[in-house]
């Protein structure tokens, strides 16, 4: 009785993400298109994504050829390899990039990595550099602090990191979310006006009959730092990305943001968590516990049993970009609990207190999606039985790198560049916890909500003892041991020129510190511009090409065989408990 595919409405393209919400932050019901939206089963990619992929996969070839032309693969010519197989895009490498959570640390470290991968960055296409990998990628996923990075890039017309860093209007992290954009060169407003705008936006949504949560305030305030528009881009929607002329033409990767489903009071563990995905066209989950998607543009509409009843309007504007970034990072809602210790107007403090009084402090991290688009859809589950859907920070299940959307077999991703800015150790450096959680969820669990192909990884102690958390490591090099799994290039945060292990809950950074962490992130991705290993660009190229070599029956070049011996985890385990982890600067 349920349709497997829904045709998404098409609108004339525009040049950028835009404030296309009908009434700012307030969702509004409108006349539905002639083909009314409905929920679809998650049995395949949407028709919109399938169509877009035809353009995107072909558009990655030139950037990939240019990158490979600069790396030394010995007698093997990587650029010619791409050219020789260009008639069959499915034979070519399909690249995903995943940027972890970790607050502003993740935005800045991840931003440095994307800066390194971007051929628009000054000097990034010189010898030993990695520029062009971003332009070669099909997908770019972000979670929590990583979603701020991804969202800021796409809400600002796919801006490069250097432009966002130098713009002066955004990324002014010396401004606290409690004070507003007082030092933005374009949008500087007084703190009183800032709070007036915050309250007005959220009140508008509430007065229209929609339940609000602390996430609404958090997402709104965050947007002032991330979106270069008046009132923090109050009318910018995530679905407007799909209307961008450049995006429709496949000139940039597809952005994906992740959140976790959590019923109030529920404890999340990786095996049972339902992972929700926001992409430019849809919102939903591939997991067995739901396996359904809704048109993102019409999120907020009153669906029941997968359809809109006759007379129900199509609601637009619910998918506010800041609300989506805030949902993915809802752990930071607790920052607003510090509001009582600030000079915030009493009316704002009262609004926060009223929400806490309603939901209880133990649920202060939830984002409320009501009406629940999946209400009474198909088989009954905790996500279809309630008229409200509650989501939380995408890293609360310990899967702090947003790998889930890139592991979906329908997307055929060959290689994932996984940038990990997690604070796993007591000294706030990564130790592989996110990869372990994803492995246990999909491969090593008796109660799986998901069973996606994923390569074997060692335990966290081994990550530290073998130094796998201090330099890039390849997992899944031998595809015969991980059928259908992508090769994962793990790129953990490490100190090159600056101790970038700042606290997840540090909410202010002066410009010098911001720039130093971004530059350190560039070094994390490039191994200090090749200073640590001059072969790194070639080895990363080998990882990118590996699964493609298998599909085309190409003999692995000697250079790549050497690289794989250096960077592939060889299965060694050392699970003894390590001492405290205090890495030193790699570049002095």
Swiss-Prot record:
Which molecular function terms from Gene Ontology are attached? lysophospholipase activity; phospholipase A2 activity
As for what it does, the entry says: Catalyzes the release of fatty acids from lysophospholipids.
What protein family is recorded?
Belongs to the lysophospholipase family.
Q: Which gene encodes it?
A: plb2
**Residues glycosylated per entry:** 41, 58, 77, 84, 88, 119, 123, 157, 167, 228, 272, 302, 340, 431, 449, 478, 481, 501, 510, 529, 553, 570, 574
Which reactions is this enzyme annotated as catalysing? a 1-acyl-sn-glycero-3-phosphocholine + H2O = sn-glycerol 3-phosphocholine + a fatty acid + H(+)
Annotated InterPro entries: Acyl_Trfase/lysoPLipase, LysoPLipase_cat_dom
Q: An example Gene Ontology cellular component term from the record?
A: endoplasmic reticulum
Where is the stretch described as Disordered? 15-38
At the top of the EC hierarchy, this enzyme's class is hydrolase
Name any Gene Ontology BP term.
Answer: glycerophospholipid catabolic process
Residue intervals of the PLA2c domain: 31-574
The answer to whether the entry has keyword Hydrolase is yes
As recorded in UniProt, its EC number(s) are 3.1.1.5
Q: Which UniProt keywords apply?
A: Glycoprotein, Hydrolase, Lipid degradation, Lipid metabolism
The highest taxon in the source lineage is: Eukaryota
Name used for this protein in its record: Lysophospholipase 2
């Amino acid at each position: 009785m349920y349709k497997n595919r829904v045709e998404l409405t098409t609108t004339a393209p525009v040049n950028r993400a835009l404030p296309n919400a009908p009434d700012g932050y307030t969702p509004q019901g409108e006349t539905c298109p002639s083909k009314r939206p409905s929920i679809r089963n998650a049995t395949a990619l949407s028709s919109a994504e399938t169509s877009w992929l035809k353009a995107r996969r072909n558009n990655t070839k030139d950037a990939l050829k240019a990158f490979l032309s600069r790396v030394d693969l010995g007698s093997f010519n990587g650029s010619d390899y791409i050219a020789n197989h260009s008639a069959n895009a499915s034979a070519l490498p399909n690249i995903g990039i995943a940027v972890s959570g970790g607050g502003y640390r993740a935005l800045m470290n991840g931003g440095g990595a994307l800066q390194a991968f971007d051929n628009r960055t000054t000097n990034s296409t010189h010898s030993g550099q990695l520029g062009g990998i971003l332009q070669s990628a099909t997908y770019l996923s972000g979670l929590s602090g990583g979603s701020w990075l991804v969202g800021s890039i796409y809400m600002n017309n796919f801006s490069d990191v250097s432009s966002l860093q130098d713009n002066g209007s955004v990324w002014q992290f010396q401004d606290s979310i409690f004070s507003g954009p007082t030092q933005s060169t374009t949008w500087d407003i007084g703190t009183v006006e800032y709070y007036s705008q915050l309250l007005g936006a959220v009140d508008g949504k509430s007065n229209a009959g929609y339940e609000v949560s602390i996430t609404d305030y958090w997402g709104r305030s965050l947007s002032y730092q991330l979106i270069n528009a008046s009132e923090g881009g109050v009318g910018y929607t995530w679905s407007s990305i799909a209307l961008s002329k450049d995006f429709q033409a496949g000139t940039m990767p597809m952005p994906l943001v992740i959140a976790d489903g959590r019923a109030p009071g529920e404890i999340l563990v990786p095996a049972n968590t339902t992972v929700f995905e926001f992409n430019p066209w849809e919102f939903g989950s591939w997991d067995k516990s739901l396996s359904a998607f809704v048109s993102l543009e019409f999120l907020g509409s009153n669906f029941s049993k997968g359809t809109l009843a006759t007379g129900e309007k199509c609601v637009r504007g619910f998918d506010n970009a800041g609300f989506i970034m805030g949902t993915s990072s809802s752990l930071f809602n607790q920052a607003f609990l510090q509001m009582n210790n600030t000079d915030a107007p009493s009316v704002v403090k009262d609004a926060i207190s009223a929400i806490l009084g309603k939901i209880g402090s133990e649920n202060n991290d939830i984002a409320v999606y009501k009406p629940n688009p999946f209400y009474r859809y198909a088989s009954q589950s905790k996500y279809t039985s309630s008229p409200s859907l509650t989501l939380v920070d995408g890293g609360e299940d310990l899967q702090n790198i947003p790998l889930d959307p890139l592991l979906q077999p329908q997307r055929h991703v060959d290689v994932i560049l996984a940038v990990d800015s997690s604070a796993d150790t007591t000294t706030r450096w990564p130790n592989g916890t996110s990869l372990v959680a994803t492995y246990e969820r999909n491969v090593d669990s008796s109660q799986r909500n998901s069973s996606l192909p994923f390569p074997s990884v060692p335990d966290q102690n081994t990550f530290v003892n073998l130094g796998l958390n201090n330099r890039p490591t390849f997992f899944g090099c031998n595809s015969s041991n991980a059928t259908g799994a992508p090769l994962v290039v793990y790129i953990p945060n490490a100190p090159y020129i600056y101790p970038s292990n700042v606290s997840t809950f540090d909410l202010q950074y002066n410009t010098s510190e911001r720039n130093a962490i971004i530059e350190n992130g560039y070094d994390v991705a490039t191994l200090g511009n090749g200073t640590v290993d001059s072969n790194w660009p070639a080895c990363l190229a080998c990882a990118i090409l590996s699964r493609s070599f298998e599909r085309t029956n190409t003999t692995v070049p000697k250079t790549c065989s050497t690289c794989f011996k250096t960077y592939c985890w060889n299965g060694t385990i050392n699970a003894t408990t390590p001492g405290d982890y205090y890495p030193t600067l790699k570049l002095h």
